[in-house]
Amino acid sequence: ADYLQLARA
């Protein structure tokens, strides 16, 4: 999973 993307959700 892309945690950098999830953190901005």
UniProtKB/Swiss-Prot annotation:
One of its GO terms (cellular component) is extracellular region. One of its GO terms (biological process) is neuropeptide signaling pathway. Keywords: Neuropeptide, Secreted. It comes from the Eukaryota. It is found in: Secreted. FMRFamides and FMRFamide-like peptides are neuropeptides. This is Extended FMRFamide-2. The lineage of its organism: Eukaryota, Metazoa, Ecdysozoa, Arthropoda, Hexapoda.
